[in-house]
Amino acid sequence: MFRSILTKIFGSRNDRILRRLNKIVIKINQLEPEFEALSDDDLKAKTDAFKARLAQGETLEQLLPEAFATVREASKRVLGMRHFDVQLLGGMVLTNRCIAEMRTGEGKTLTATLPCYLNALTGKGVHVVTVNDYLARRDAETNRPLFEFLGMTVGVNVPGLSPEQKREAYAADVTYATNSELGFDYLRDNLAHTAQERFQRYLHYALVDEVDSILIDEARTPLIISGQAEDSSELYMTVDKLIPDLIKQDKEDSEEYQGEGDFTLDLKTKQAHLTERGQEKVEQWLTEQGLMSAEESLYSPSKISLLHHVYAALRAHTLFERDVDYIVKDGEIVIVDEHTGRTMAGRRWSDGLHQAIEAKEGVRIQSENQTVASITYQNYFRLYEKLAGMTGTADTEAFEFQQIYGLETIVVPTNRPMIRDDRTDVMFENEEYKFNAIIEDIKDCVARNQPVLVGTISIEKSELLSHALKKAGIKHNVLNAKFHAQEAEIVANAGYPGTVTIATNMAGRGTDIVLGGNWKAEIAKLDNPTEAQIEAIHTAWKARHEIVKAAGGLHIIGTERHESRRIDNQLRGRSGRQGDPGSSRFYLSLDDALMRIYLNEGKLNLMRKAFSTAGEAMESKMLTKVIASAQAKVEAHNFDGRKNLLEFDDVANDQRHAIYAQRNTLLDNEDISDTIDVIRADVFNQVIDQYIPPQSLEEMWDVPALEQRLKHDFALDLPLEKWLEEDNHFDEDALRQRVLDAAIEEYKQKESIVGEQTMRSFEKGVMLQTLDELWKEHLSAMDHLRRGIHLRGYAQKDPKQEYKKECFQMFTDMLDALKLSVVTTLSRVQVRTQEEVEQAERQRQEMAKRETASMQYNADEDSGEENTRRVGRNEPCPCGSGKKYKHCHGSKAKY
């Protein structure tokens, strides 16, 4: 209560920040006449002047008003667009490590030019991050003329570029890229074998477009570079046959309830669990198949892999639906992004789930993969010195942005007042009645020439509605993962009078739906359009634009509420852009997933009783509260999941930083001999400690075993016992030093043979290769540990603390193994002098000549042709071996 009173008096924090920033907007506006008077050359010269002032100690904050005024004036001259005051506000928000919530159609692409130019003045590079290749290319080409006018270079980083093209893109002042490509390039850089193979430079400033999609919706999706593991496709096919015989049970067994089913499902977390009855049934079937013995349990340590296959197959059949979670395309399983409805080509589910779905659908099962390198988007984007983002819907997730990324969300006002009519939700008893009402609403809109965008949550639902519209005789376009190629054209036409478009979730996001259709897209289709053609197209568009405005603008129909209010707002946000008219309404039913999963049976029954007649629609404040309550539960659950993921991944992240920092140091230094010397001393001391414990009596020493170990692991044949006999006063420290000196002397002899440069290169190669191999094994071990760590909770232990503790020990063990492996490899390597190499090469060439001659003589003999001169048995063999012919090739000759 007191907070609301104070807010009314002083305004919200958002209002106070905007008031402060508005003072800077006034300064920029006051500079406009001065900058308008500048010639093009004088305006271009501002960039070098700003860089010089930065070098002299001025800050970006001090340069901001003039820099923004420069970009605004350049945009007017080059692009024909002037930044509105609200876009200047948005630019300042993005400069201050914040997230700017800017409504659809407010010009986020143009707004981004302001902070990008300012931060690029440092010369450290700026990354503009988009959700797909199309948007990265489009935005780069749109803004390229502006940046190049101001002396800035622009790069585009999308999949499929050559190494040279990638380096060029990253070297640019402003680089447009997709989030996935940036993350994968970071991982690739940390798998590089030379410094020249790396692409990325210092991660300075990232501006993330559609920041909610990347930092929240995709936060739980790790980026993984993997190599093939062992093939177990046959086992997936075998286990797949078992699942259809299992029976679902509605809830888990307890003291009060004993079910008759084999498994239960948790739809919230998409997990499946076998009941005791189910476990017995599965074990019996696996025993019959010869995959386990009757005495063994599915949960015994030796059968964990088999259990893993069973659960993967169970989840594939019961929790993942075709045309909802994935599609089958060209004989492959392609994941459908649950948030955008787009296909995610190249992505694969982990934990064997993808292989289980391939077995279920009867397509070729690809080998499982072993993780070589991985990182989450959460941890990748936290690597940037400065991070900012923009989206049309961020305020509902402001708490998460602040908690996880330290980013404050600022809502930027619209340039023109929002006049969209957001109507009350309508609830129906079942899906059939709901679809009937939706079709009637669409018919009414089409009759009035009002365009309609219908949002669905899955491909399956979009096709169901499409079928219903066909039966009703209503022409429409469908935009989902199956028709991804036509996305741009469908979105461009979605604003035409009376056009009906069905879209899954936010497919087409990032492209504005223009009332009356996109006239610029029409012109782009023409080859060398004339002024007359352009004028005709624009005139026709104006007429259509007025028709649609008179009909009420774009009408949005939501066929279900999504799990998050933010995604509902994204759908609504497609209408009412830049002060245009528009309307929206959500149609719901008690069959909707949100209702079934997150409302208890009591509330659902109460709501069913509220419907007195078939097909009745219900609108009430109670309904709005119930839906808001369900969405709040989902959002809290999802936030906890992402936070939990981050807490676990932070353990790996700290270790990743340490390994990658060490790796980069190795790549950047040609000479790592000092590091090798330190490692060698550590390893020999640890090895000696095992046989001669520190501060111990001589009776506890095992010198013969130490001699054997040094000979076997380090190729050092040292007479330790003889040394001790020769010197009665020979103590432990002296022995250690003598062993180390002998190892160093042996190593220096090898170095003198091959040369210092060769040995330095070899050391670096061994270190990198060993580090990569052990890190890969460590990632796999951490993954296995994480899968089962939740079981520690049953022993009253905190799984997170246990995970941290064990991962730290595993990491320490890995570093010890790294040192030992490197020193062992370097000690055991055999080197040869240049003379020995040349002699071996001569022998190889002589052997090759003999083999050639042998083949020739054998060919002559086998051909049946007689030689003009027969070689005598006691003459030297013509092959050059030096032997008599009868003891060489003559032994095979036919006389």
UniProtKB/Swiss-Prot annotation:
Disulfide bonds: none annotated. The keyword Cell membrane applies. Residues 833-852 have a biased composition (Basic and acidic residues). It is a peripheral membrane protein. PROSITE patterns: SECA, SECA_MOTOR_DEAD. PANTHER family: CHLOROPLAST PROTEIN-TRANSPORTING ATPASE, SECA INNER MEMBRANE COMPONENT OF SEC PROTEIN SECRETION SYSTEM. Monomer and homodimer. Part of the essential Sec protein translocation apparatus which comprises SecA, SecYEG and auxiliary proteins SecDF-YajC and YidC. Belongs to the SecA family. This is Protein translocase subunit SecA. It comes from Pasteurella multocida (strain Pm70).
